[in-house]
Amino acid sequence: MSDTPHADVETTPANPRRRQWLHGAAAGLAGLALGPLATLPARAQGNGTRLRIGFQKYGNFVVLKARGTLEKRLASQGVAVQWLEFPAGPQLLEGLNAGAIDVGTVGETPPIFAQAAGVDFVYIGNEPPAPQGEAIVVLPDSPIRNVAQLRGKKVAFNKGSNVHYLLVKALEHAGLAYADIQPIYLTPADARAAFVQRSVDAWVIWDPYLAAAERQLGARVIANGEGLVRNTQYYLAARKYAAAHPQVLRALLDEVDAVDRWARDHTPDVAAQLSPLVGLDAPTLEVALKRAGYGVQPITDATVAYQQNIADTFSTLKLIPGKLTVASAR
């Protein structure tokens, strides 16, 4: 893990231009992993009395929060757990940049935008790929039958989220450029409203919003991540917190992995538990859960290379300022 930024990227969080860029981007939006933690230096300062976790409305963090096993485990270390909810990954990382949280889980694209904006974090683990858990959808009566027919169309999605990369790769696969569509940057809730009102022609979204759109609206998938992207969920921590409290993060990932292993074999139970928490019926959640990846994995060289490809793609499209080196956040 290197503290030296890439020469083309100013990574000082206090840099006003980068902070302004990050706020602008966010406003437009809505024991397996011990390897990386074992290498973390123990020199940085941090708050050892609490672990502030950023989470989204759906996922294993929601189950972990409901079960309370992490709180019980960390109580013996004198660490209190606090949970803060965010609408999507980019906003969660804005919270990490502001010092509101210490750790969170996001898709594969938010870390790229965040690192480009100077957010000081490290990757501490990831989930297996879940390419079917995100897709480009249209309304059931839409004349659009494939991605190639999105030329000139309005496509809604959360800028800087995992589906942003899916859209770029799907367009590329269909022979289109990003400039060939009209990107409409909306949070999931606003994007769904625009989709229903036919203010946009297509919507790029992830589970469980995807499953809900399919079951409730009859949304038709014209492309998902299969053969295009991995759709990997990453666990990120503020660099200073990770350096000062690796044992706390080890406990977190251990408990997440335990929840994952249980959830993989108890999908109906997880769906029933999540239903009142996320406001979706259990059958819809079961659809989403069956497409998810389970089990915490360590960050590998292959993982870093994949993330670097995403960074290079967005740099080429000039969607992030300059170039960055993903490995510096390892």
Predicted regions located by residue number:
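Secondary-structure end/capping motifs
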Residues: 243-321
